[in-house]
Amino acid sequence: MYDQTLLAPLSFSEGGSDGMTRPFLLSLLLVTLVLAPSASADDGAVYFKEKVFPILEERCFSCHGGKEKLKGNFRVTSREGLVVGGDYGSGIDAESPEKSLLLEMVSYKNEDYQMPPKEKLSDDDIDVLTEWMKMGAPYDPELEIKGDESERRGFSITDDQRNWWAYQPVVKPSVPKVDSELAAFIDETKPNPIDAFLLHDLSEAGLTPNGPTDAKGLLRRVYYDLIGLPPTPEEASKFATHFASEPDHALDAVVDELLARPQYGEKWARHWLDLVRYAESNGFERDNSKPQIWRYRDYVISAFNEDKPYNQFVIEQLAGDEIANPTMASVTATGFHRLMQWDDEPADRKQHVYDVLADNVLVTSETFLGMTLGCARCHDHKADPISQKDYYSFMSFFHGVTPYETPGTIRPWAEPAELAAFEDRRKDRVAAKRKEIEALEGDMIDYLKEVGKFRKDKAAPSVRTYVDDARGTPATWSFVTSAPAPGWKEVGSKAFKNWTKAQGGFGTEGTPNSFVTTEWKEPKIWMRTNFGSKEIPESLVLEIFHDEDVEVYLNGVEIFKASGHNADYQFVELGQSALDAFQTGNNVLAIHCKQTKGGQFIDAALRTGPQMPGTLPVALNRGGKRLEGELSKHFGREIVKEWREAKNKLNSIQREMPGTPLNVVKESGSQPLPLQVHLRGSAHAPGDEVEPAFPSVLGGGDSPVPASYEPVKHEVGPATSGRRLALAKWIASPENPLTSRVIMNRLWQHHFGRGIVPSTNDFGQLGEDPTHPELLDFLSATLVEKGWSLKEMHRLIISSRAYRRSSTPDSQNLLEDPQNTLFWRYDMRRLTAEEIRDSLLALSGNLNPEQGGPWVYPELPPEVLATASRPGKGWPISQDMMDRNRRSIYIHVKRSLRFQMLADFDQADTDTPCAVRFATTVPTQALAMLNSKLVNDQAVVFAEMLRADGEDDLRSRIHRGLALVTQRKPEEAEVEHCVELVERLQSERGLTEEQAMERFALVAMNLNEFMYLD
């Protein structure tokens, strides 16, 4: 009677004939399925009239068919009413008719809704309705009663809604005059308009603002607000001296200096990444990494450092590939569209496609516009003038965007000739930088060999290389990419005689830190090389770079195995099993490596291994800060610092590749598929078709986007529709009433702790009203006047007297304005999670300032690693200590496995936009600061640094330590108290002075003065 195949899940793919794509044909089939029954019209009408209608009329119409208010808002007198559904959703499930809500109700399967409520239908009646659902729920047109579904879904905008403050044009207001009683709180020679607006409202409320904070408090404020790091005692002392004589000039000079530092971009990029729910993995059970997505993070950092005009910043993220003359940066920016969670095994693939698009609509509308469009996905917005049609018209701008894992979403950006020329230049630069590093390392390595402090055997045998890697003179390997015969890894095997021979360094160009000599693109590789030796070495070292899973054999014996990928060469001391496998004469080193996706690389070296490694990075990894202290004492800090900077620069040069793989947006073509309103938000219940349009209340609605936009052709990949560019230009327009207001409110929030509109992602009627609407409009208009420069707005805000106010409570003001709504004082705040960790590393001298590049993996406690959804796959700890000590913004953001200390201190959730981090106070925070390995390790290093600085006197070391922690000159009583603590720990607890100083360092790092800004 009906075609069951129409109910099968539909797949999506490109292509087709007759000028029509398969997705278009499939959507027509789906419309046919949902809006018309799959049985013939005559058969369906007859079945409905004879079998179904009598049941509905007798048992259902009285509650769900009259003209009065429908129970549950659910009508069954028409097919439209059945599809639209009521409070519990649509009555029909087109994919699984037997699971339709109507059948669930009449079968009494759910205690919450059993219909009819007085008496259950007979089994025969339920069978009739079940068969009817399988037919597609056809109705007899003559018996349908349409009712008032159209009225129920009607939408109109009232005058009050249209006149809502956020939808009005931004007009720069006049600066108010300041009451004479508060004139002392504004600089009359150089008045800041911010102060005038705030003082005007304070005067009307009868409140007097606080006076200024001290120089130390102000400097910490500026440093943490702009770069997220503390000033040094020397910087604090210099500022205090300058501030005492020329406060305005001193503050302006510091602000200019900090805005020019690269750390500014790292700090403010973190705020932005919270908004766009940045993560480097997909989430869900597998939670695989997003290849190359870190380049979007680096783009954001660079954009802030360059002071990229905010309107351009918006356009590049939404449509950086569609602008005229796109750059690598603008194309990288479209990684914005790839930040969502991605389920690679959704139960409902069609619905999942639209769930992803819905996520994009939500993030775009909240981040750039402060509009909660997501509330209109299933029905008209309950509070704001946003219809369901508005929602899907907005989604239509993104409708051509392909799913995350569609081939082509990760692609290189460079022409072959350009790439070849750049590679030649890069190799020359790498060679020159290596020569510089070798010169710096030479004397230090000789010194370490001489003192033998970190070597068990001072004989220090010379290193012999049996198999070299691509960084030196690469060995010749025999290899295949399909499974070889057994015995391939044994000495004397002839299974490899027909294998291909090539030099080591197998992989794909662009894999970070790699030295690709031989291209390898297949999923697996088996490789072996021979070497000879006249004697058995005392120790062996394997240096290996593997991406991803690897097994290493020596003469058929497995000597190393690892899963996941390394971001660089790893130094592995081989155990007794390797020495037992080693033999005089001929030896075979064999490797099997397998790769799943993304860039790939495998390379290895085998050498003899003295107890003291012959490379300085490995020596420092083993000896840590104590060894670096020895080197600094002998050679001077500047030499060691110069060596570290040279190493960082070498890493940076190795990553500079114009042929970079980019995780970018991709569209299905220049003509996206039609999009319909989804009834109740279901992709299986399409309604009226929509065109791209801006929200009605902002001038869109029935007027689609002007037809002036055209498909955009690209040198790489198919043409795109141009729709995203039209949307981006509208959002970034000075005439858009929301864009400048929203971003200025965010800037204010991150300087004052709370936005002028406290609900920073919601400027609608469910959000909070602005406390100072005229000030917000003044700042928004000024931003546009200043060419959308965020750095200029930082200068304006920080130069205000309001920013300098102390945090001291005032009893009268607290009674009148306990929430500090009028900004009469500065709101004290705790450092953010990233600021705490970065400050600890900076304090101990361990912070690695290297900029950009792939994510890093600091150590995680075993109990945290045990929670990984895929044990052993989640967190390959970075082997280089320097990498582990980079700023927190470079730590891998894995949705299912958070870096514990950052999570403890309220790091943003990565599943939804985070506009405001709410500071919690929970026991685990105190426990982390006292007991975690991270904090205790830094306390040990901090104490050692105080000793290594040459301060032999205990009192002097404590004085220096407190000055570093608090950025001020310690009081004598404080120093004396800490001296007593150290002495008591020695006398009463039996600790050595070194151990007692480590406890002092731990206590100092827990001071409120370190953890809070006031």
What are these model-predicted stretches?
Residues 26-36:
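Bacterial N-terminal signal peptides
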Residues 47-61, 128-132, 360-376, 394, ...:
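Sequence/structural segment immediately N-terminal to covalent heme-attachment motifs in c-type
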Residues 103-107, 193, 197-202, 303-305, ...:
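An acidic, gly/pro-interrupted, aromatic-rich
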Residues 300-304, 365, 570-596, 782-784:
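Short, surface-exposed tryptophan/glycine-enriched loops
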Residues 468-485, 499, 565, 576-622:
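An acidic-aromatic loop/edge-strand motif
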Residues 499, 523, 531-556, 589:
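Aromatic-lined ligand-binding clefts that engage carbohydrates, nucleic acids, or primary amines
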